[in-house]
Amino acid sequence: LDALGTTVATYGGQNIGAKKLDRISKGMRTCVAFGLIYSVIAFFLIKYLGPTLLSLFIGAEEKSVLADAQYFIMHWVAFCAPLTFVYVFRFMIQGLGFSKLAVFAGVFEMLARGLISLFWIPAAGFEAVCFASPVAWIAADVFLVPAYLWVRKKLHREFGVTAD
C-alpha cells in the first residue's frame, strides 16, 4: 500500500505539471481499486495462512501468543481498505503540492491513537489495542477524503477546468 501512495504522489505531481487534471481522478480511482483488491487478497491470505506464517516467528508451544497474534493481525488486515485511502489520498494531496494539508492527516491519526490509549485501552485492554491502528486510519480518512475533494475543486478552479 505504501508503494501505491508513492506512485500516486509522483503521478499526481506529473499530471498537475502537465495540466492534465482529468488523469488525476482516473489515477486515483485506479490506485484505490488496486488497494481494495490488495486488501481483499491480503485478508484471505492472513485468514488462512496467518497461523502458519506466525509460527515461523512464534514457537508452537506459545499457543496463547499465537492466538493473540492471529487475532491482532486479523483486525489489522480487515481494515486495509481504510489504510488504502490513507496512503492514496495523503500522498496524492502531497503530490499535488499541498504537503502542509497532508500533515493534518497525521495529526488526526495521532489524536485518535492518543485518545484510544488514554480511554479505550484502559477500559477494554487488548481488544482496544487491536483496533487502535484501524481507528486511527479511519480518523485520518475523515480528514483526507474531504481534503482531497477540496484540493481537487481548488485546482479545477485555478486551471479553469470543469470537475470530472
Question: Which residue ranges define each predicted feature?
Answer:
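Transmembrane helix-loop junctions in multipass membrane proteins, especially transporters and channels
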Residues: 51-60, 92-99, 121-126, 149-157
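C-terminal transmembrane helix end/exit motif
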Residues: 134-164
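Hydrophobic, well-ordered secondary-structure elements that form the walls
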Residues: 17, 24, 53, 69, ...
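Small-residue-rich hydrophobic transmembrane alpha-helices
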Residues: 1-44, 48-50, 83-97, 101-105
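Membrane-interface helix-loop junctions in multi-pass transport and translocation proteins
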Residues: 50-52, 110-142, 146
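Residue-level recognition of transmembrane alpha-helices
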Residues: 35, 73-76, 80, 106, ...
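Interfacial segments at transmembrane-helix termini and the short loops linking adjacent helices
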Residues: 49-76
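Hydrophobic alpha-helical segments of multi-pass membrane transport proteins
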Residues: 75-89, 140-151
